[in-house]
Structures are given as C-alpha cells and as structure tokens.
Regions:
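A nucleotide- and high-energy phosphate-metabolite-utilizing enzyme signature
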Residues: 1-222
C-alpha cells in the first residue's frame, strides 16, 4: 500500500497522541479557525478504532463531539473551507468534466466532485448534532433518527452515496486489472444510458444537500 501523501500516519508524531493530548489538540484547532487547523481536524473527525482499548476511542469521540457541537464559530469556519467544493453538474444538468489535464479530458473526478462534497456536508451536519458515527452511511442514518433528515432524504442520500462509490470502485478495479493508474476519474461516456441518468440524479441530490447546508450554516439561500 502506498504511504499517505499528506503524511497522516501513526509514524507522524502529530497523529500519535494520548486521549488527553487529542482533547487539547482539538481544543487548539477549534480556537484557531484557520485553514490548516480545519483541514487537520477534518481528517481527525473520521477516525475509527482498529486496535487496542475501544473504550478509549469511544470516550474520546464523545468528548470531541460535544466540544465541536458547542463551537458554532468553528462549524461556520469549517463550512467556509468547503463552500466551493461543488459537484460535477452544470447549471443545465450536464456533466462538468475535467478539461485541465489532457490525460483526463472529458472525465469526471468522482471523488473531488462527487463523493467528497457529500461526505463533507454529511460530516458537518453530524458534527453540529454531536453525532459520534464516523462512516457516512451511519451518519446519514443517525441524522435521520435525530429528525434532521426525513425518510426520503435518508433513502435518496444513501442510494446516491452507494451509486457513486460503486461506479468509482468498479472503475478502480478495472484499471488495476489492466495495469493502469488507479485514481478517481471516470469517463461518463463509458457508462450506460441508465447509469448516466442515475449518476445525474445522484449528483443533483448531493447538490441539493449542499445548498441546504449552505443555507443552515450561513443563512444564505443563493
């Protein structure tokens, strides 16, 4: 497995702390409100326990969830950092493809303009509600149980996430088998007409979610 390009690994002292040290670190990031602090805490919020005393992770997540939910200025700053992370859907409903790099011309970066905008929006709503779930689908379910998402929203958002991750995973598996670079770009022309329609609908659902989050965190409806 390739090492994390951002050096977000246990061999980096920044990401190797005791529970009490993590609480102090999150408190510091929460008071700074700058780009680096928000980006690092954004990564931290999705942590999951994989080894050792699971209760340590549970207690830490509960404590951090309460800290962030009470920090409205920080939540607003978090939204500001992700405000321009839009989906790959144009004003008239067509796909917005990557035309900057010749290698990916006509393709969609399904992570940066698909799953990422959704993950960020769901994470932000979950942090505001002090939800301790880390996985996106689990967060959607928790938001539904709290009454933040209705039944239709729960179903459509979960379906949209599963569709995007499914398309992306299929492409990555195919590229790996063919010895190609495994990345996040997908050519919509390689999808069936039905898949293209479903992808368009999924991106529209995510775009609507982001508009809602923008309205709730900035009171701006445009």
């Amino acid at each position: 497995l390739p090492l994390c390009k951002g050096y977000c690994m246990a061999i980096n002292p920044l990401w190797r702390k005791t529970a009490s040290q993590w609480v102090r670190q999150i408190d510091l990031w929460g008071r700074k409100h700058n780009f680096v602090a928000i980006r690092l805490s954004d990564i931290f919020f999705d942590f999951q326990s994989v080894y050792g005393d699971v209760n340590l992770a549970i207690e830490l997540r509960n404590q951090v969830a309460k800290m962030i939910a009470a920090n409205h200025f920080y939540l607003s700053a978090m939204f500001s950092e992700i405000a321009d992370h839009n989906v790959a859907l144009g004003f008239f409903g067509g796909f917005i493809t990557d035309d900057e790099e010749q290698e990916f011309k006509g393709q969609i970066n399904l992570k940066h303009t698909g799953t990422l905008p959704m993950v960020e929006a769901i994470r932000l709503l979950s942090l505001r509600e002090a939800i301790t779930e880390a996985a996106t689908l689990s967060r959607i379910e928790a938001l539904h149980l709290k009454g933040i998402l209705d039944e239709t929203e729960r179903e459509t958002l979960a379906a949209a996430f599963e569709l995007l991750t499914g398309i992306l995973l299929d492409k990555q598996i195919s590229d790996f088998k063919e010895g190609k670079h495994v990345g996040y770009h997908v050519d919509p022309e390689t999808l069936s007409g039905r898949q293209q329609k479903r992808l368009t609908e999924a991106l529209k659902i995510i775009d609507d979610l982001r508009k809602r989050v923008k309205s709730e965190f900035t009171a701006d409806i445009f």
